[in-house]
From Swiss-Prot:
Motif extent ('HIGH' region): 34-44
Function per UniProt: Catalyzes the ATP-dependent condensation of GlcN-Ins and L-cysteine to form L-Cys-GlcN-Ins.
Similarity comment text for this entry: Belongs to the class-I aminoacyl-tRNA synthetase family. MshC subfamily.
E.C. no: 6.3.1.13
Record InterPro entries: Cys-tRNA/MSH_ligase, Mycothiol_ligase_MshC, Rossmann-like_a/b/a_fold, tRNA-synt_1_cat_dom
Native organism: Corynebacterium glutamicum (strain ATCC 13032 / DSM 20300 / JCM 1318 / BCRC 11384 / CCUG 27702 / LMG 3730 / NBRC 12168 / NCIMB 10025 / NRRL B-2784 / 534)
GO CC entries: cytosol
Pfam families named in the record: tRNA-synt_1e (PF01406)
UniProt protein name: L-cysteine:1D-myo-inositol 2-amino-2-deoxy-alpha-D-glucopyranoside ligase
Cofactor: Zn(2+)
Keywords: ATP-binding, Ligase, Metal-binding, Nucleotide-binding, Zinc
GO molecular function: ATP binding; cysteine-glucosaminylinositol ligase activity; cysteine-tRNA ligase activity; zinc ion binding
Chain ranges for the short sequence motif 'ERGGDP' region as given in the UniProt record: 176-181
Length: 404
């Protein structure tokens, strides 16, 4: 069943443009990864769970998927946390990357084909920055001490198309989310950093435009387009990345490669709050995946708790969310042990496909299985799923990533 998703750039739900089903050409999907300085919290997990659903639906539609994810393993938050804890930033990054991968595996999230760190893509970034400089889309600030390289916001005539934000909103988010509008020497306050000239105490790499390290946005531009092509199918992440990160990543790639759009579809997942308050490190109200699984909560219940609300909305997580999900899991298992009506089983599988293909309508998908389960007489002592029950069990595993 063809997949439709909301496109942030076009502000509408529309069909995802893919190569023909069964072809040798994969669907290209790039999702921004973590900065590895803390454990994986539920906000991270919810984003990757949304794109895991997309991956599963594409596989169900007989598509191969080339899934790429980056790791921002050289960045200020990582350095700051390492300094605070008195550890080497490389060791901190490695430990958190390993924990992240372990959490994703625990949640049955299909791993990317390419999992690329910023450090290992330094040469790719340097090449793209050089291209932007050669094309006049970037410049070096006149600063003898720190000759940083910036991308001109005017390098493309479509800047702003991905986020659809007005100038005031862009300026606000640029300042709040890693931008440096007051940096002396910039031609425009909104010009984005491409290459940070070497500073004492910071890692740096040699380049034709001086020693330094990559800016945040250009890392994703280089990693994505070097693996998926200059214009690929799906670019994704959390809604907090819509601007500036995804807007600038697209602008850098489009200016460097001369394409209209870096991605055909821009997809974003909403934020997660805890008991009505946005999860944040500063508030200390993060719900960590590793703690939930260590406490004995099944990964399938965590997935169902997240899927109870639509991926694009900002969602709340609390103890009731998990309790409801665990009860749902138990109810579905009971139904699968007693199911005998093959037509009903086949029908609910098709309903699952239909809901998930309609912009990941997980509430509708879960309700469809609930309705199927409610119609089954579960007075049985059997501990095994019936042959008919296994039809639904297999679909729930393949499409929702939930094992009964």
């Amino acid at each position: 069943m063809p997949l439709e998703l909301f496109d942030t750039a076009d502000q509408e739900v529309r069909l995802v443009e893919t190569p023909p089903a069964g072809s040798d050409t994969p669907v290209g999907m790039y999702v921004c990864g973590i900065t590895p300085y803390d454990s994986t919290h539920l906000g991270h997990a919810a984003t990757y769970l949304a794109f895991d659903l997309i991956y599963r639906i594409l596989l169900d539609n007989d598509h191969d998927v080339h899934y790429v994810q980056n790791i921002t393993d050289v960045d200020d938050p990582l350095f700051e946390r390492a300094a605070r804890d008195g550890v080497d930033w490389r060791d901190l990054g490695t430990s958190q990357i390993n924990l992240f991968r372990s959490d994703m595996e625990a949640l049955s999230i299909i791993p990317p084909k390419d999992y690329i760190g910023a450090i290992e893509s330094i040469d790719e970034v340097i090449e793209m920055v050089k291209t932007l400089l050669d094309e006049g889309a970037a410049y070096i600030v006149e600063d003898a001490e720190y000759p940083d390289v910036y991308a001109s916001i005017n390098a493309t005539d479509k800047f702003g198309y991905e986020s659809n934000y007005d100038a005031a909103t862009m300026a606000e988010f640029f300042a709040e989310r890693g931008g440096d509008p007051e940096r002396p020497g910039k031609k425009n306050p909104m010009d984005a950093l491409l290459w940070r000239a070497a500073r004492e105490g910071e890692p740096s790499w040699e380049s034709p435009f001086g020693a330094g390290r990559p800016g945040w946005h250009i890392e994703c531009s280089a990693i994505a387009t070097n693996r998926l092509g200059h214009s690929f199918d799906i670019q994704g992440g959390g809604s907090d990345l819509i601007f500036p990160h995804h807007e600038f990543s697209a602008a850098h790639a489009e200016a460097a490669h001369g394409v209209e759009r870096m991605a055909k579809h821009y997809v974003h997942a909403g934020m997660i709050s805890q008991d009505g308050v946005k999860m944040s490190k500063s508030l200390g109200n993060l719900e960590f995946v590793s703690r939930l699984t260590a406490a004995g909560h099944e990964p399938g219940a965590i997935r169902l708790g997240v899927f109870a609300n639509h991926y694009r909305g900002n969602r709340d997580w609390n103890a009731e969310s998990l309790a409801t999900a665990e009860q749902r899991l138990a109810t579905w298992r009971e139904a699968a042990r007693a199911a005998t009506n093959r037509e009903d089983a086949i029908a609910v599988v098709e309903q699952l496909r239909a809901h998930l293909s309609a912009d990941l309508d997980t509430p509708g998908a879960l309700a469809a299985v609930d309705n199927w389960a409610a119609g089954i007489d579960t007075t049985t002592d059997s501990k095994e799923f019936t042959e008919v029950g296994n039809i639904v069990v297999a679909a729930i595993d393949a499409l929702l990533g939930v094992q009964l």
